[in-house]
Amino acid sequence: MADTLERVKKIIVDRLGVDESKITLEASFKEDLGADSLDVVELVMELEDEFDLEISDEDAEKITSVGEVVKYIESHK
């Protein structure tokens, strides 16, 4: 899980330009990290590429925090 979190953090830092220290498992993409809906869509696409998986639109709408995306990736490897 630590490796997954580190890879997710790197993508978030690259995409959103936020300080890595703000990225915690509890951090909300929109409220805590300042992402808008387009940012979230782009994050999902990058995560799909990075982890070689497909996140359905329905699932993507439910993923609102860093911890949720890490859990999703871990359970779909």
From Swiss-Prot:
Keywords: Cytoplasm, Fatty acid biosynthesis, Fatty acid metabolism, Lipid biosynthesis, Lipid metabolism, Phosphopantetheine, Phosphoprotein. Coiled coil: none annotated. It is found in: Cytoplasm. InterPro entries: ACP, ACP-like_sf, PP-bd_ACP, Ppantetheine_attach_site. The gene is acpP. One of its GO terms (biological process) is lipid A biosynthetic process. GO terms for molecular function: acyl binding; acyl carrier activity. The modification O-(pantetheine 4'-phosphoryl)serine is found at S37. 4'-phosphopantetheine is transferred from CoA to a specific serine of apo-ACP by AcpS. This modification is essential for activity because fatty acids are bound in thioester linkage to the sulfhydryl of the prosthetic group. It holds the Pfam family PP-binding. It comes from Brevibacillus brevis (strain 47 / JCM 6285 / NBRC 100599). Pathway: Lipid metabolism; fatty acid biosynthesis. Carrier of the growing fatty acid chain in fatty acid biosynthesis. GO terms for cellular component: cytosol; membrane. Belongs to the acyl carrier protein (ACP) family. This is Acyl carrier protein. It comes from the Bacteria. Gene3D superfamilies: ACP-like. Residues 2-77 form the Carrier domain. Its main location: cytoplasm.
